[in-house]
Regions:
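Bacterial N-terminal signal peptides that target proteins for export
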Residues: 1-8
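N-terminal "domain-start" segment that seeds a small globular fold
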Residues: 20-43, 128
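Bacterial N-terminal signal peptides
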Residues: 8-17
Length: 129
């Protein structure tokens, strides 16, 4: 019985994702603001590989910034774009504002890859990406 409920929940989750997803747009059609408040259009990265990672300064996986920076440094000249997208939607693990996030990332991990301002990634106000 438990397995049937589990599978039903998985199917419902997948269905709700399919219903709300916007398949009329490509990744290049979306815009964010960067941590300085400037427009960051993904169309600038056309014909490049874009790795988009949801990040948070107080997450248990915050150390991933170090690996993300290494990947960025290694492959940016080969057409790879690393894009960090901070969100506070998962356990309030990104409480800082853009300036605090930028200072944290640069001071602690030497981040030089593009980062967006903090955006909601779930719920009614989720960023459309």
């Amino acid at each position: 019985m438990f397995h049937k409920i589990k599978y039903l929940l998985i199917i419902m989750t997948l269905f709700s994702t399919v219903v709300t997803a916007n398949y009329d747009k490509l990744a290049y059609d979306f815009n964010f603001n960067d941590l300085d408040g400037s427009n960051l259009s993904l169309s600038e990265y056309k014909n490049k590989v874009i790795i988009v990672v949801n990040v948070a300064s107080q997450c248990g996986f915050t150390s991933q910034y170090e690996d993300m920076q290494k990947v960025w440094e290694t492959y940016q000249d080969k057409g790879l774009i690393m894009l960090g997208v901070p969100s506070n939607d998962f356990g309030n693990q990104e409480p800082g504002n853009s300036k605090e996030i930028k200072n944290f990332c640069e001071a602690k991990f030497g981040i030089t890859f593009p980062m967006t301002e903090k955006v909601p990634v779930k719920g009614e106000n989720a960023h459309p990406f």
